Structures are given as structure tokens and as C-alpha cells.
């Protein structure tokens, strides 16, 4: 039974995404349905966590929009994600960057990896 589930989920995994880690700045192109039409919305922000593994892997991206912090958690292998672009690579020493929620302005910056 476990082998059948593994075979089914292996077909659903997406391999077209780039490697990214917490601290990286991403542009996530998400398909959004509005009424009867579908468009692509770009959500750009810092990855604050990656969670789980396999087909159920998710990641959370945080950005500041009009002075308000916005976080979006997305399934990595979702068909709703059109593409993911890494715009900056960041240096961090943590796997979960929850402390960024309490920082404002220049204090919330992350150093860039060379």
C-alpha cells in the first residue's frame, strides 16, 4: 500500500522549481481565478520557512505591502504556481525566520550571499 502511494505522489512532484532556502527573496507567479478568467499574480518576498517534505512540502513568503506585513503559505508542488524565480540569495543562520515579524525597516534586511 505504501509503495502505491509513493508511486502516485512521485508523478505529482514538480522538478521545474529552482533550489531556494529561507532568507532568499523569491518572485512567485501564482495563477489566480477571478470570475471566469485566470491571470497570473506575482508575489515577491522573503522565504521565512520551508516545511514538511515530499508532496506536502510548503513554504512561506513574507513581504511588506503598504506598511502591512503579508505572509503567504504555498504548497511547493501546487499546479497553481506557474513559476518561481530567485531574485536574491540571503545569508541566515536559522531555518525559520519568525523573528523578521518583529523587525521594521532596515533592521529587517538580510545580507546577500555572493
Curated annotation (Swiss-Prot):
Q: Which GO terms describe its cellular component?
A: cytosolic large ribosomal subunit
Q: What family is this protein classified in?
A: Belongs to the bacterial ribosomal protein bL19 family.
Q: What does this protein do?
A: This protein is located at the 30S-50S ribosomal subunit interface and may play a role in the structure and function of the aminoacyl-tRNA binding site.
Name by which UniProt lists this protein? Large ribosomal subunit protein bL19
Q: Could you confirm whether the keyword Ribonucleoprotein appears in this record?
A: yes
Looking at the keywords, is Repeat present? no
User: What superkingdom does the record give?
Assistant: Bacteria
Q: Name one GO biological process term.
A: translation
Q: Which HAMAP family match?
A: Ribosomal_bL19
Q: Which InterPro entries match?
A: Ribosomal_bL19 (IPR001857), Ribosomal_bL19_CS (IPR018257), Ribosomal_bL19_sf (IPR038657), Translation_prot_SH3-like_sf (IPR008991)
Keywords, ordered alphabetically: Ribonucleoprotein, Ribosomal protein
GO-annotated molecular function = structural constituent of ribosome
The encoding gene: rplS
Amino acid at each position: 500500500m505504501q509503495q502505491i502511494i509513493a508511486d502516485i505522489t512521485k508523478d505529482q512532484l514538480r522538478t521545474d522549481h529552482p533550489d531556494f532556502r529561507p532568507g532568499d527573496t523569491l518572485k512567485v507567479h501564482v495563477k489566480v481565478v477571478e470570475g471566469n478568467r485566470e491571470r497570473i499574480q506575482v508575489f515577491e518576498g522573503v522565504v521565512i520557512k520551508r516545511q514538511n517534505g515530499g508532496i506536502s512540502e510548503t513554504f512561506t513568503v513574507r513581504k511588506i505591502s503598504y506598511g502591512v506585513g503579508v505572509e503567504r503559505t504555498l504548497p511547493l508542488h501546487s499546479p497553481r504556481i506557474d513559476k518561481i524565480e530567485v531574485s536574491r540569495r540571503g545569508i541566515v543562520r536559522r531555518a525559520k525566520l519568525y523573528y523578521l515579524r518583529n523587525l521594521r525597516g532596515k533592521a529587517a534586511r538580510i545580507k546577500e550571499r555572493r
